[in-house]
């Protein structure tokens, strides 16, 4: 008995199969889409320090609302002392 014959015999499974197929396709598409982003690194041998090439002016978040970069005074003091 093939899969399609089973679906024709039990028609109540058709919506479940459709929803599961759409969900699996969407999850796979999102996984592939996420792998093509610039902040995902698949090959660490070519670029062992990828954080050096990140542009600080380009937001890495999906949405940034009223976010301004300011240096933290305490952190700057610690960096000056440790250098």
Curated annotation (Swiss-Prot):
The organs and tissues expressing this protein are described as: Expressed mainly in stomach, placenta, small intestine and colon, as well as in normal mucosa of esophagus. Down-regulated in esophageal squamous cell carcinoma.
Per the record, the GO terms for biological process are: response to bacterium
Alphabetical UniProt keywords: Nucleus
Which GO CC annotations does the UniProt entry carry? mitochondrion; nucleus; respiratory chain complex IV
Family annotation (InterPro entries): B12D
According to its UniProt record, where is this protein located?
A: Nucleus
| The keyword Repeat is annotated on this UniProt entry | no
Superkingdom is: Eukaryota
Question: What's the family?
Answer: Belongs to the complex I NDUFA4 subunit family.
Check the record and name the PANTHER family matching this protein.
NADH-UBIQUINONE OXIDOREDUCTASE MLRQ SUBUNIT, NORMAL MUCOSA OF ESOPHAGUS-SPECIFIC GENE 1 PROTEIN
Q: What is the protein name for this chain?
A: Normal mucosa of esophagus-specific gene 1 protein
* Source taxonomy: Eukaryota, Metazoa, Chordata, Craniata, Vertebrata
């Amino acid at each position: 008995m093939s899969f399609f014959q089973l679906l024709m015999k039990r028609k109540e499974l058709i919506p479940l199969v459709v929803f599961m197929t759409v969900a699996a396709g969407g999850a796979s598409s999102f996984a592939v889409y996420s792998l093509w982003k610039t902040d995902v690194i698949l090959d660490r041998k070519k670029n062992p320090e990828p954080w050096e090439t990140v542009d600080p002016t380009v937001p890495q978040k999906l949405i940034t609302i009223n976010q301004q970069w300011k240096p933290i005074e305490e952190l700057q003091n610690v960096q000056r002392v440790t250098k």
